[in-house]
Amino acid sequence: MQFTTILSIGITVFGLLNTGAFAAPQPVPEAYAVSDPEAHPDDFAGMDANQLQKRGFGCNGPWDEDDMQCHNHCKSIKGYKGGYCAKGGFVCKCY
């Protein structure tokens, strides 16, 4: 009776040590360095509205989906057969 109790406690402690429940806490990583905004000029500064609209590949939300535009975009990428608008119509998913 005592042997099984000691064995079960030992297995429990060993299992908790392996899962990291009693492990020492890891140090918190330093905050990421944010670069100066003037060091990287705005990428969209020289683009007109037509160029910015093309970046969504037709998936501009659930009420403004153009699956064919997304499908044609994915077909233009080597290795993909087509695509569709996913994640509520905001993401062009290629297959």
UniProtKB/Swiss-Prot annotation:
* Propiece span(s): 24-55
What is the name attached to this protein's record?
A: Fungal defensin plectasin
What Pfam families does its record include?
A: Defensin_2
Residue numbers spanned by region Binds to membrane interface: 61-64, 86-92
Which cysteines pair up through disulfides? They are 59-85, 70-92, 74-94
What Gene3D superfamilies does its record include? Answer: Knottin, scorpion toxin-like
Q: Which residues participate in beta-D-GlcNAc-(1->4)-Mur2Ac(oyl-L-Ala-gamma-D-Glu-L-Lys-D-Ala-D-Ala)-di-trans,octa-cis-undecaprenyl diphosphate binding?
A: 57-59, 67, 73, 84, 86, 88, 92-93
Q: What does this protein do?
A: Antimicrobial peptide that potently acts against several species of Gram-positive bacteria. It selectively inhibits peptidoglycan biosynthesis through complex formation with the cell wall precursor lipid II (1:1 molar ratio) thus inhibiting cell wall synthesis. It does not disrupt cell membranes. Is especially active against numerous clinical isolates of S.pneumoniae, including all 90 different serotypes and isolates resistant to clinically used antibiotics. In vitro, shows considerable selectivity for bacteria over mammalian cells.
Keywords tagged on the record: Antibiotic, Antimicrobial, Cleavage on pair of basic residues, Defensin, Disulfide bond, Host cell membrane, Host membrane, Ion channel impairing toxin, Membrane, Pharmaceutical, Potassium channel impairing toxin, Secreted, Signal, Toxin, Voltage-gated potassium channel impairing toxin
Listed GO cellular component terms? extracellular region; host cell plasma membrane; membrane
One GO-annotated biological process of the protein: defense response to bacterium
This protein's species is Pseudoplectania nigrella (Ebony cup)
**Variant or mutagenesis effect after changing residue 67 to A/C/E/F/G/H/I/K/L/M/N/P/Q/R/S/T/V/W/Y:** Complete loss of antibacterial activity
